[in-house]
Design a protein with these regions (language model features):
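Active-site-proximal, Lys/Arg-enriched surface segment
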Residues: 1-67
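Short, conserved catalytic/metal-binding motifs centered on acidic residues
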Residues: 29-39, 74, 115-124, 139-142, ...
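Short acidic, glycine/serine/threonine-rich loops at helix termini
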Residues: 43-48, 75-81, 91-92, 126-132, ...
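Electropositive, glycine- and tryptophan-enriched low-complexity nucleic-acid-binding patches
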Residues: 52-109
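Domain-level cores of phosphate- or acyl-group-handling catalytic modules
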Residues: 92-148
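An anionic, glycine-rich sequence signature occurring as long contiguous blocks
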Residues: 138-251, 355-370, 378
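Short amphipathic alpha-helical "interface-anchor" segments enriched in bulky aromatics
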Residues: 229, 233-283, 310
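A short, flexible helix-boundary coil/loop motif
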Residues: 280-378
């Protein structure tokens, strides 16, 4: 099924022309592959289900996605079903999923810098980054800061900090970025890797953490991109959050539950869910380019494009009814005779009482003792 999806994907991309995700890709405008894991709850004991790190019970699949950018959605490149207790930063799993995603792209085993792989901190291991470097692709991977981060932060000169940007390119208030590659011991990491730190004031009401320094929340990521401003590289890395939207949409197409008992059967279900997600993405890519529906999620597409816009059912015997009136099974049914009374046999109701009329007292409910009430009593 995955091989068939790859063959159809390359055919769809060739039909899309200039709207294809691989149209005009280069080191400055690469094909983006996002890798992230998610949790899927299992409400009964199933093969492979296990406790998760969040206290639940189920599976921990690792996924990869082709990002269509701000003007589109995305496609499922690979899904690897794992037990719920699988490690979030397992390098072997990340390497397998990335290899399958590169095979789906059809650009060769070493596509070069025209492919960008983005991963959160779970992919920030020496094995995973080394694999990406050997494949000669661009990468932007979350980097775990060491324990002596406060000492590193104190060595950064003020002139090294540059304002961070929002997704729209405007400066972000209270956020800055700086490169700290020369301040770290990167022995064992691939050559040419850069580490960029981001500092930002926590939002009002947010709780401070023990690793916050001088009131700033510090994060970092690693990349092998040598050109571009630091703020632009940091925005490019944070746009990896679109992968969360793709995972949420995939859960609407079948990834959100695993009703089957066997692990192999649930792996097939993952492929079916990926195919359903890709069919919607391909339909939007080929038929809805330039329309707001190009970015709609599956539930919204289903309601507005498939269900809400279907043609109405023709009336029996109407001009738009393709069936002849005498061929309809209800044509020769004798009409039901009307009931002699509109209330279906009930006696007619008494006319409504006149205004100010009081019904006579019920003898069964009158008092057996005491004086009678006056006639003009309310």
């Amino acid at each position: 099924m995955e091989a068939a999806r790859g063959e159809v994907r390359r055919r769809v991309w060739s039909l899309a022309g200039e709207n294809s995700p691989t149209a005009g890709i280069s080191a400055e405008s690469p094909l983006v592959i996002d890798v992230d894991a998610t949790l899927v709850e299992a409400h009964s004991a199933k093969e492979g289900a296990a406790p998760t790190f969040k206290g639940g019970f189920g599976y921990h699949p690792l996924t990869a996605w082709f990002d269509h950018g701000a003007d589109g959605a995305g496609e499922c490149a690979a899904i690897m079903l794992r037990p719920g207790n699988a490690g979030a930063n397992t390098a072997a799993d990340h390497i397998e999923v990335i290899s399958r995603a590169l095979a789906q792209a059809g650009l060769g085993s070493r596509p070069g810098r025209k492919v960008l792989v983005r991963i959160d901190g779970a992919g920030g291991t020496k094995e995973t980054v080394g694999f990406l470097a050997r494949r000669r692709v661009s990468y932007s991977v979350g980097f775990k800061l060491p324990g002596h981060t406060p000492d590193i932060y104190s060595k950064i000169p003020k002139s090294a900090w540059a304002p961070a940007y929002n997704a729209d390119g405007d400066p972000r208030e209270g956020a800055d970025v700086a490169e700290i590659t020369d301040l770290l011991d990167l022995s064992g990491w691939p050559e040419g890797m850069r580490v960029i730190m981001r500092r930002e004031r926590p939002h009002p009401g947010a709780r401070l953490r023990f690793d916050d320094v001088d009131g700033y929340r510090l994060t970092a990521f690693a990349t092998n991109t040598r050109t571009g401003q630091l703020a632009d590289l940091e925005v490019r890395h944070r746009l990896r959050a679109r992968c969360e939207d793709r995972i949420r949409c995939a859960k609407d197409t079948g990834l959100g539950s695993f009703p089957l008992q066997g692990l192999a059967a649930n792996r097939i279900r993952c492929q079916v869910a990926a195919l359903a997600h890709d069919l919607l993405a391909w339909s939007q890519l080929l038929a809805l380019t330039g329309h707001p529906a190009r970015k709609w999620e599956p539930t919204w597409v289903t309601f507005n494009y498939f269900w809400h816009r279907r043609p109405p059912r023709p009336q029996v015997g109407a001009q738009d009814d393709p069936r002849p009136a005498d061929a309809h099974p209800r044509h020769h049914r004798p009409p039901r005779p009307p009931h002699p009374h509109p209330l279906q046999g009930r006696p007619p109701l008494d006319p409504p009482p006149a205004p100010g009329h009081r019904p006579p007292p019920d003898p069964a409910r009158t008092l057996t003792s005491g004086p009678p009430p006056p006639e003009n009593a309310p």
